[in-house]
Amino acid sequence: TQENVLVDPLQVLRCDVRVFRCGPILKIVLRILEASLAASRSQLSRHLLDKPLLEKSGQLTSDAEREELKNALVAAQESAALQILLEACLETEEDQSKPELMWSLREVRSIICSFLHQIFISEPSLAKLVHFQGYPRELLSVTVQGIPSMHICLDFIPELLSQASLEKQIFAVDLVSHLSIQYALPKAMSIARLCVNTLSTLLSVLPSDMRLELFQPVLKSLVRICTAFPSLLEDITSLLLQLAKICKSQASLGHCWND
């Protein structure tokens, strides 16, 4: 029912998977999703107005806290919707086996990227949230090339890169490499240099198993950065030579990398 959709707008996306390979129908679903998310936001705001905080009791002590919780719920709903749409852009075995589905996938990716672009333009904070949550790295080439507003990611990549999670650091470096190819700008080069410096620091402090976990996935990213910014070639070559020396030293001690 409409009331159920207002409570949980993500129900709109719980549809037949074939919808995500049919461009015209997907456009309709996205229009419904956009309206449902807006209606849900409006209903939550109306709820706060209709149910004022009469006395400071329980866990909520101010209207500001209630507003903060509402905004967090809205952000969670919207980011979850975007994550579902991103997952729909993944190539499946069925796509590979049917040429007509590959054409449909390209169309669907274009439609979803256009939708995400509008969302990111209107809510840059949502772009940050989605990328801090992360998504399959094989989609980075799709999002960076298909979403014109992806350059705004350059603003928060240093913060993403500083996270303690190796997974987030790998994602950040990979994201920078694709952005560097797409936007060979001074700002992108500065962020790319920061990535190289961060990797150099991590190389000297990480244990061998975590070093392997970090550097194997980012090797292709470093190649892309070199392609976009040849001036960083010397720094990246130095980093890789240092990595090779450490690996050789560990191998001599019986701690070689696994193939």
Which residue ranges define each predicted feature?
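Extended alpha-solenoid scaffolds built from HEAT/ARM-like alpha-helical repeats
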Residues: 1-259
